[in-house]
A protein has these predicted regions:
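Short, charge/polar-rich alpha-helical segments
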Residues: 1-20, 45
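Short, charge-rich amphipathic interface segments used for partner binding and complex assembly
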Residues: 21, 27-69
């Protein structure tokens, strides 16, 4: 086999190996992104519920304070 062809085949082999490493890393990053998005969504949902509960508690406090002022 011609030395130039060997060199080109060797280069193709290196590029294919790099391509596979990159593909594996992309799959890993996509998995991390899905997990991160899920975690973010769960935390955001929890904070929305916490905010609603705080608002309800503040409303209860304000109502009690208003009742006490009118006694």
């Amino acid at each position: 086999m011609d030395a130039r062809i060997k060199h080109l085949n060797s280069r193709i082999d290196r590029l294919e190996a790099e391509f596979e490493r990159n593909r594996q890393q992309l799959l890993h990053l996509a998995d991390e992104n899905r997990r991160g998005t899920s975690d973010y969504d769960a935390l955001l949902e929890r904070n929305l519920h916490i905010n609603d509960e705080i608002q309800s508690l503040l409303n209860a406090i304000w109502k009690l304070e208003e009742q006490q002022q009118h006694q």
